[in-house]
Amino acid sequence: MATYKLCSVLALSLTLFLLILNKVNSVETISFSFSEFEPGNDNLTLQGAALITQSGVLQLTKINQNGMPAWDSTGRTLYAKPVHIWDMTTGTVASFETRFSFSIEQPYTRPLPADGLVFFMGPTKSKPAQGYGYLGIFNNSKQDNSYQTLGVEFDTFSNPWDPPQVPHIGIDVNSIRSIKTQPFQLDNGQVANVVIKYDASSKILHAVLVYPSSGAIYTIAEIVDVKQVLPEWVDVGLSGATGAQRDAAETHDVYSWSFQASLPETNDAVIPTSNHNTFAI
């Protein structure tokens, strides 16, 4: 009898352990990492002027044969697989983190260089939108929920809808009119490191920009309800654009890019992600 009870207790304990383990592991994850870029990489979709150089640099906007950036140029790159960012059945939302390094070089002083680059999430199979100050992800400056697009922009030109401070970081929700901005000082031609994190539980989107060359650090954060902004499945990408006037141009070079997202399959699932208040760069 004692042996039977012991077996029953062990069986029950094992069942509970498996249930807990299943709950911990009930998380849908996706991740990718490019420490450099390779021409012909099937995991990336290049749009517009975007190309990958033989030296492993992702150029979002065109460089002329004389080595100078071209005006009126727009380019984007998308991760080739869609990301499940929230689930309609369970109501769960993914936490995510992306990191990338880039540089912007402005060889011209007149007219003012333009326009910037942006990390964005939006509907799958989308095509580049208007360039210039719309950065390839919007077609006008109106607030329009049909865009279903979220972006973190690094804007170098003050358009009529922008704050007077440029350059600035902006959080864009269904509009190029940022819901929050933070000025930063462009370190011309120097590499910047970016970390963008979204914590689904607090709904806080947080971005950090660091210039290792100068030690300058810039941060921005805002509450964003991803489920009210984005479709269930999204493309994630980087987009850049130059200005509409001759020589209103700059380079938008990306050297590395990583992304990870964790979507719990139930509201009780444990998400094994890093501390979203920690920003190691």
UniProtKB/Swiss-Prot annotation:
Binds one manganese (or another transition metal) ion and one calcium ion. GO terms for molecular function: carbohydrate binding. Homodimer. Residues 269-281 form a propeptide. Pfam families: Lectin_legB. Residues 1-26 form the signal peptide. Belongs to the leguminous lectin family. Galactose and N-acetyllactosamine specific lectin. The keyword NADP does not apply. CDD domains: lectin_legume_LecRK_Arcelin_ConA. A minor C-terminal proteolytic processing site is observed at position 268. This is Lectin. The keyword Calcium applies. It comes from the Eukaryota. Keywords: Calcium, Glycoprotein, Lectin, Signal. Glycans are attached at residues 43, 139. PANTHER family: CONCANAVALIN A-LIKE LECTIN FAMILY PROTEIN, LECTIN.
